[in-house]
């Protein structure tokens, strides 16, 4: 199983039935799988905080949700996480393509890449950083369950080395 297949299968096997996403080159194959899957409702959004809001509404309507995004959008989401998700105890599995840390060629990605883990810690979102597809499959399922139990988001950070398993 390659990197994208592991993420997709773990989402399915976690019982997630509603996904929002923001476009990302690393996540594009996963997003294509989700678009083709009739058992999962996939709603592309234009901004990450919009995804937080849509996932919140879906959760309140009885759905099990996930948000797929690039780490550059984490900063955009902080207010929605603090004022909506934390206050109303909304579990969301957040799968983040972590740019700006390893092998990054776009200098504008580097600051957020360096701050991502600290931001997650500041807003008290637990996170896991799997290195292989098998590890990602297990940790995504664990993170989804933890999110439900905590009634709060849990994140998966997928760095550049992880995505090399798609090649």
Swiss-Prot record:
EC number(s) recorded for this UniProt protein: 4.1.1.79
Domain of life: Archaea
InterPro entries assigned: Sulfopyruvate_deCO2ase_alpha, THDP-binding, Thiamin_PyroP_enz_TPP-bd_dom, TPP_dependent_decarboxylase
GO MF term set: sulfopyruvate decarboxylase activity; thiamine pyrophosphate binding
Alphabetized SUPFAM superfamilies for the sequence: Thiamin diphosphate-binding fold (THDP-binding)
Classification via Pfam families: TPP_enzyme_N
Gene3D superfamilies: 3.40.50.970
Annotated GO biological process: coenzyme M biosynthetic process
Keywords from the named record: Coenzyme M biosynthesis, Decarboxylase, Lyase
Reaction(s) this enzyme catalyzes, per UniProt: 3-sulfopyruvate + H(+) = sulfoacetaldehyde + CO2
Biological or metabolic pathway of the protein: Cofactor biosynthesis; coenzyme M biosynthesis; sulfoacetaldehyde from phosphoenolpyruvate and sulfite: step 4/4
Function: Involved in the biosynthesis of the coenzyme M (2-mercaptoethanesulfonic acid). Catalyzes the decarboxylation of sulfopyruvate to sulfoacetaldehyde.
Family designation: Belongs to the ComD family.
PANTHER family reported in the protein's UniProt record: SULFOPYRUVATE DECARBOXYLASE (PTHR42818:SF1), SULFOPYRUVATE DECARBOXYLASE SUBUNIT ALPHA (PTHR42818)
Subunit structure: Heterododecamer composed of 6 subunits alpha and 6 subunits beta.
Protein name: Sulfopyruvate decarboxylase subunit alpha
Gene symbol of the encoding locus: comD
């Amino acid at each position: 199983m390659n990197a994208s297949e592991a993420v997709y299968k773990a989402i399915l096997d976690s019982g997630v039935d509603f996904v929002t996403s923001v476009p990302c080159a690393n996540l594009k194959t996963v997003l294509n799988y989700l678009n083709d899957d009739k058992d999962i409702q996939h709603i592309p959004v234009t901004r990450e905080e919009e995804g937080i809001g849509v996932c919140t509404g879906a959760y309140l309507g009885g759905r099990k949700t996930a948000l797929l995004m690039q780490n550059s959008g984490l900063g955009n989401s902080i207010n929605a996480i603090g004022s909506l998700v934390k206050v109303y105890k909304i579990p969301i599995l957040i799968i983040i393509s972590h740019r700006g840390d390893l092998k990054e060629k776009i200098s504008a990605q580097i600051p957020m890449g360096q701050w991502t883990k600290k931001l997650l810690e500041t807003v008290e979102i637990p996170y896991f950083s799997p290195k292989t597809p098998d590890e990602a499959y297990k940790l995504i399922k664990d993170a989804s369950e933890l999110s439900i139990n905590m009634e709060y988001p849990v994140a998966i950070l997928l760095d550049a080395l992880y995505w090399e398993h798609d090649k």
